């Protein structure tokens, strides 16, 4: 069952008596039943004579229909051509006595009725044996009538056997009020499968489990999520997908304690200006025309000064006077101030954007490692720590136990675990929605946290029981244990 993921809670109540209760599907998914239980404190129901057994108990049975191989053939008996069938359907919209759909429904109802009568035969036979008289004549009459009725029943059974669905009955478990109140089971019912439950005994049987979906369905949702843009969900600035080249350039640009603009006394300074211009091109963002001209003028001016210095040195064969060096240094300082201004205050400087992104990533990592009270956004999930816990923090791969309440943004509760067995999950293994995988990291035992999860990190465009499509979900979580 590792290929199926639980998505919602399933529950079914089966009362005692000859009542067939179908396994109802509230929405298209597979049902997995994992527990059958009774309430030992409830009053036991009496039998037909008003008696209660010494040890009240209930037996749960599963009844399923076998595959009806001739259903399609039966529907196609009246015509071999699909066109003829369409014409006949148009002529008789409401159907008639020989309508295949009606006859099929009637046969199923008759079969269910027959099954209910069969379940009563056991108790009826015991009552008949107790009320039977010892008179020999009476016995002969009853036998004669019984034979006649049996022959009639056999004839009617032979007539009804053709076309009726077959039922298979299986005993699941027997529960009593002294030792066995509940029984773990593992029954999977696929969508469209005809399955019924019936209980014989004194108490109601409660069946619980989950609606489950195949893992492959999540991959389709992931493909849909790729179509969503950042603007559609209004992601915070800096929380976005980046290429590997961006990460490499960030690591090269950021070294603690190193100034962003470094003074170089050699001729390598002449090569710095083209590099800065190239970085702006790398970011695929254009500077205003005026700023571009300023940069070009500065570069051209610097090159002219360098050429003059070389000419003086070549013609005279002497070192350049100190005054000219001072002028050159002043030119350097002016140029550096101008470049720093463009980098820090330019409307589209890539260095500034990368620095901001890197700082936000550092803040996210710090928030995960050291939880603190307050609201923060981590990878699109809004985390509000209401109470700090103690001990080590949750990391990927940990199995945790917790309580939670799930709500929509309008305050409507769609799921909760407030008592009984706590909810357990292994973090980072795809057992829950992505918003939980992100929001549980960094919690401590005893801590309380509110997660606000956008749709693309929850169920996306898929509607769930009590959860409309594209819903933002709010979870209040209390961590009980880290295993």
Curated annotation (Swiss-Prot):
Residues 108-121, 130-150, 298-309, 323-344, 351-370 have a biased composition (Basic and acidic residues). GO terms for molecular function: peptidyl-prolyl cis-trans isomerase activity. Residues 397-483 form the PPIase FKBP-type domain. The keyword Transmembrane helix does not apply. Its main location: nucleus. Binds to histones H3 and H4. PPIase that acts as a histone chaperone. Histone proline isomerase that increases the rate of cis-trans isomerization at prolines on the histone H3 N-terminal tail. Proline isomerization influences H3 methylation thereby regulating gene expression. This is FK506-binding protein 4. It comes from Chaetomium thermophilum (strain DSM 1495 / CBS 144.50 / IMI 039719) (Thermochaetoides thermophila).
């Amino acid at each position: 069952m590792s290929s199926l993921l639980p998505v919602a809670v399933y529950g079914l109540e089966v009362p005692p008596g000859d009542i067939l209760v179908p396994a109802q599907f509230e929405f298209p998914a597979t049902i997995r039943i994992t527990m059958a239980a009774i309430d030992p404190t409830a009053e036991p129901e009496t039998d037909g004579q008003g008696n209660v057994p010494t040890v009240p108990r209930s037996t749960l049975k599963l009844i399923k229909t076998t595959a009806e191989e001739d259903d399609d053939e039966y529907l196609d008996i009246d015509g071999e051509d699909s066109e003829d069938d369409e014409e006949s359907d148009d002529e008789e919209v409401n159907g008639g006595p020989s309508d295949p759909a009606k006859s099929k429904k009637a046969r199923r109802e008759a079969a269910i009725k027959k099954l209910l009568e069969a379940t009563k035969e056991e108790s009826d036979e015991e009552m008949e044996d107790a009320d039977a008289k010892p008179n020999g004549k009476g016995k002969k009459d009853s036998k004669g009538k019984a034979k006649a009725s049996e022959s009639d029943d056999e004839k009617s059974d032979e007539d009804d056997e053709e076309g009726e669905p077959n039922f298979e009955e299986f005993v699941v478990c027997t529960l009593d009020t002294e030792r066995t109140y509940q029984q773990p089971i593992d029954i999977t019912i696929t969508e469209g499968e005809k399955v019924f439950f019936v209980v014989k005994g004194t108490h109601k049987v409660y069946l619980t489990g989950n609606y489950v979906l195949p893992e492959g369905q999540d991959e389709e949702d992931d493909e849909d999520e790729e179509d969503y843009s950042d603007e559609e969900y209004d992601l915070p600035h800096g929380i976005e997908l980046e290429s590997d080249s961006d990460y490499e350039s960030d690591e090269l640009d950021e070294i603690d304690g190193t100034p962003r603009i470094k003074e170089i006394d050699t001729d390598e300074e002449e090569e710095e200006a083209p590099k800065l211009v190239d970085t702006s091109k790398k970011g695929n963002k254009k500077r205003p025309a005026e700023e571009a001209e300023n940069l070009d003028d500065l570069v051209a001016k610097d090159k002219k000064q360098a050429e003059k210095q070389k000419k003086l040195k070549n013609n005279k064969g002497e070192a350049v006077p100190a005054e000219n060096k001072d002028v050159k240094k002043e030119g350097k300082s002016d140029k550096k101030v101008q470049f720093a201004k463009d980098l820090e205050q330019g409307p589209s400087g890539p260095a500034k954007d990368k620095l901001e992104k890197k700082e936000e990533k550092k803040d996210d990592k710090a928030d995960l490692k050291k939880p603190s009270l307050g609201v923060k956004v981590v990878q699109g999930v809004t985390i509000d720590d209401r109470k700090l816990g103690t001990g080590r923090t949750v990391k990927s791969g940990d199995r945790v136990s917790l309580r939670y309440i799930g709500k929509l943004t309008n305050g409507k509760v769609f799921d909760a675990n407030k008592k009984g067995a706590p909810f357990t999950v292994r973090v980072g293994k795809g057992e829950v929605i992505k918003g939980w995988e992100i929001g549980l990291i960094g919690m401590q035992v005893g801590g309380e946290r509110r997660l606000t999860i956008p749709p693309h990190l929850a169920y996306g465009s898929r509607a769930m029981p009590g959860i409309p499509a594209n819903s933002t979900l709010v979870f209040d979580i209390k961590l009980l244990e880290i295993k």
